[in-house]
């Protein structure tokens, strides 16, 4: 063969994926080809199906296990895949009785054509007597849905919650039936009853034990010797939890209690046989109650895990301590010291009472005569953890013997003798020995009184009572059931005295549960109601104690209590943690922020948190959306800088309101708000205000503002006084220049308005604009000074005159001299004049973006040597921000206005004499080279005829529209 040339030494060893032993995993593919199957047949025939490691050497990527499974399950010609015969099933049952249900390879040798896997599946899915082959009940389906929500498709795990159902049967029933009924169960609300119930897993061995007992009962109702010995050996090894239900005993009856004997009179056994549809009423003298001891720090009954009831031939039910997996070994050892087995002659019920706290986990009965156990109540045993809530034990359990004669003769009295009772004042101390217990003996009393039957209802079965609810009856029990078995008729329950007699101040809520009518039908479903939402902790046996006792450091979880439900959650008081500082800054620092000022010496802020400092500023949270309460330290700095911004911005804001100021003056005939006027200031600091009609008003600035200005605009006075001081300094400088016989270069700046006529109205026409002025126009640093000041040529005006332009956008004059309304608003030609200085430096915006600056520097409107200081005065307008497109649009509009206005003035007023040209050359030489380089457009060598002044200016000013 070709495959024989391939040896293991020639192969490359594969990784073992974490395994340290076993064959190397050389393949993960599961598809076998036809060639591989043929090679496997020949190899098996060559080695006679014995040496599978040698057989695996014929394949490069196959292990010996894969080859074995492929041969046994698929390729073996002797393999039988058909249905099982009756003879094969009988052989499997006999072999399992001989070898046990684990040696499947040995069992398969006696069944030709069958492998161990087939035998195992046949037993667990069909032949096992513990399998429940009946139709699925509604409770089982609801329990399956509940368990499937937790474990999913782990069918082997689901078998622990559904005794008698195999994993294969559960899987088939889920996909065939339950999965389709899921929506109907959800809508009907039946599934909600199982949501609050925790799942209690079952031991398969317990079901097998009950089934094994059933199968080994002989005709006389007795166990054979082999079955009895096997049961004894099992119970000696471990106490197995068992849940008894009607379905476990469908094909026969099992004797329970003291009437069940390994051998005895069959007639007596038949009279006391337990059937699935009969009820069981125990007598008080035959009741054996085993109560687990609970330590002082385990008062919370919710800490106990699930537990079951176990059966044994010792004539009682026992509490399974082995299932308390979460309890320490010492605790379990103390529990094991409780005497569990009781015989029929035992008339006592032992109650473990450590630390004055009783925790009744399971009440078990040894008498099988009269236990009231309908089939619908079988599920109560399936969820014993719901019954493990706290119960208050009646004072009647510890009543003195001399109190017996004072009680109604019909009431069953449980009292403890003075010699046996160990509950005293010392039991109030938590240091009492955990092994302390007292014995409650049944009352013997008068001869005519015998203990009445007792129905012990756990706290789970009552919604309003937290005590151990006892319903005593007459000597002859008068409990009857109706036809369908859904109600229990209680005879004369008015004599019952129960529920927390240990305190004189029992609440009405606890007493409202008792039935005062002579007869009343009590639904059985009331006993199956859900547990209360809140767990009950057991009260201590202390006098006058009515409220639940809560201890610190018990580990019991308690919900956060608020002062009032009417108040919002943010009004609560949260005390400061003492140990861990990070608890003060629990989620988003709420604990610190919500701390009341009454309990906190100083207000605490969110950014004091160790983690909040790093994440609060940059993270998005609901706290950042609050207005003023939770501001970061950055906002405090902004509030300080806002004062500087307001001072720097006062000039630009004040002059934009001058027209409003003059409109409110008493002399409304001057009509300052409807025309363009000029204020001339002379050396004596008098202001001459010229309106459009040529009228003039003069006076001191102080008299102007004090006489004309309303009170709400008096804050502009200081701003105008600053302007007055600036004008005086400019006059002094011009005077010095005139004494040196150097012609001063006039500085002009005007406000450009666009009117309906389409032509600009210049406040001071006839002025010449030099190249230095054009350069200064394009410099953002000097815009405020040029806006507030304008010096006129000393040939036309006084050398010391300074004019301030006041512009009103409402009305303007056309060519004919008539006043015309202007619908468009006045528009400043510079964005630097109309916005406050240094506003928004600390806030991120598109103006400070490096992309904006990089795109602005090589712009044709700005030279490449523009410094950062010049860029510092480019800000966003107040109360708004621009995007990148809006920024460039705003700059282009205003710089176009600069260029158009400067070019129009130069072309319209172009001197032709030699003196003017010499003056231009002198200006060019004396100008700062830095300013000269900042011009927008240079028309130095361009001249136009004077007659075309209007046409040229109109052409150049098209960009302003």
Swiss-Prot record:
Record-given protein name: Transcription factor MYB3R-4
Location of region: Disordered: 1-33, 390-457, 534-555, 756-781
Bias-annotated ranges (Low complexity): 431-444
Summary of the knockout phenotype: In EDC plants, defects of cytokinesis. The double mutant myb3r1 myb3r4 often fails to complete cytokinesis, resulting in multinucleate cells with gapped walls and cell wall stubs in diverse tissues (e.g. in embryo during the first or second division after fertilization, in stomata guard mother cell) and several pleiotropic developmental defects, and associated with the selective reduction of several G2/M phase-specific genes transcript levels (e.g. CYCB2, CDC20.1 and KNOLLE). Hypersensitivity to caffeine, an inhibitor of cytokinesis. Impaired powdery mildew (e.g.
Organism: Arabidopsis thaliana
Chain residues forming the annotated DNA-binding region: 52-75, 104-127, 155-178
Compositionally biased intervals (Polar residues): 391-405, 416-430, 764-781
GO MF annotation list: DNA-binding transcription activator activity, RNA polymerase II-specific; DNA-binding transcription factor activity; sequence-specific DNA binding; transcription cis-regulatory region binding
Tissue expression: Expressed in roots, cotyledons and leaves, especially in vascular tissues, and in flowers.
A Pfam family reported for this protein in Swiss-Prot or TrEMBL: Myb_DNA-binding
Keyword Transcription regulation: yes
Listed GO biological process terms: defense response to fungus; negative regulation of cellular response to caffeine; positive regulation of DNA-templated transcription; regulation of cytokinesis; regulation of DNA endoreduplication; regulation of DNA-templated transcription; response to fungus; response to salicylic acid
Bias (Basic and acidic residues) ranges: 534-554
Domain of life assignment: Eukaryota
InterPro entries the record matches: Homeodomain-like_sf (IPR009057), Myb_dom (IPR017930), MYB_TF (IPR050560), SANT/Myb (IPR001005)
Coiled-coil positions: none
Transmembrane segments: none
Presence of keyword DNA-binding: yes
Compartments it resides in: Nucleus
